[in-house]
Amino acid sequence: MNFSDVMREESKWTKTENGADAKNTTDSALLDMFATIGSMRNRSEDEIIQKFELAFQEDPLGAMRCLFWARDCRGGAGERRVFRVLLPYIANKHTDAMMKNLNSIPEYGRWDDFYSLIDTPVEDEVWERIKLILDTDSILMEQGKSCTLLAKWLKKADASSPNTRKLGIYTAKKLGMSVYDYKRLCVKLRRYIDVVEQRMSANEWDTINYPAVPSRAMMNYRKAFARHDQERFDEYLNKVQSGEQKINSSTLYPYDIVEKILYGHEDSKVLEVQWDNLPDYVDGDVNAVVMADVSGSMSGRPMATSIGLAMYFAERNKGAYHNLFMTFSESPQFVTVKGNTITQKINFISKVDWGYNTDLEKALLKILDVAIENYCSQEEMPKSLIIISDMEIDCCTNQKHRENFYDYVSRVYDEHGYKIPNVVFWNVDSRHDVFLADKDRKGVQLVSGQSASTFKNLIGCVDKTPVEMMYSVLNSDRYQAIQI
């Protein structure tokens, strides 16, 4: 290896916030994007754009599919900000790629994502499509048939927010309508598709069809429903608990519920039934353990995400590790989930020892120590360890110079006669580029985000490399509509 090769290799190394050696790339720009895009809510727009552009140069189709996976609120990461940061950039820099995928925007996201494309080369095409859909919805409404939710997400020309009102007036202009006609049509369509906010504004609380209220609206308005329509709302929730009625939870994430209990100290029947009705992405008996980072750097939403995902998986896993997970900070602990309600369970977990360190080394070696002390065979070990963290781990005790974290832990397991289980590094708060394994490490997967739907992608990927797992997601049937 000549000096330039050494320099090139050295440029790939960085330090975590706690001083551990780590890579700043997986050696695949697309994987760098996939492994962080679900957890980049607090990164700058320039960082987000640079990451996408490098991925696009490496694999244009993969980058576009990763973009829509990131936005996908049902099967993907459900990240709105990152998607809206990238839409205008792609429309300006890769216009053809954006034009070919315009129709997919409301399929994976929402109709109001289109507003991010104002003042770009595809804006005229956007308004043509919106006008066509709006005209079609008007006809379908007159015929008493089902129509889209476009009217729900079009900006109101009489909104209280100046920016929203400005966009609403602009929308009317671009659709060739007077503000009055635009407002009248939107109100008519919103009432027809039964947008719950319309009934709330009209003080028609006793006419709200609670089983039809969308997931996030039910969460956001739960206190208003209880305040204005208490008897009927309580009756509805009791019927949900008994299985007579349904409640929508499909677009919620575990942290949505956990943070309201963990930080808001709320004990709500709505949160209880929505937790119970989250989509189940865990396929029965799964031989895996979640390791939840509860260190100081995870405070706020990342902590709620870590605890929420760990509880979600432990509850729904019907195998040997049902209701079991592990926390790690200064001292790793095995946790058995206790309690009858989600509030009781979170209150119990909040009493577990949460420290300020991020000692992932100690946590992974505790798994090894337990196996050694109890003479466990390889077959008795968990098949997979799912590590949910910001990846800002502590410096390891015996890690060699320029030895990546996964390679170090794998070496320690080997020295004691064990093979390290499959490891998933799940990043929930990517503050800068830190990767604990590269793209070719067999038995490692790199994922990101807050969504429990990621579990379904992990179940069948044990022993795959990070790149293999990524492409199993991006090239799945769900993203075949995205083309270049």
Language-model features, listed with the residues they occupy:
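Long lumenal/extracellular ectodomains of secretory and single-pass membrane proteins
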Residues: M1-T305, E315-I484
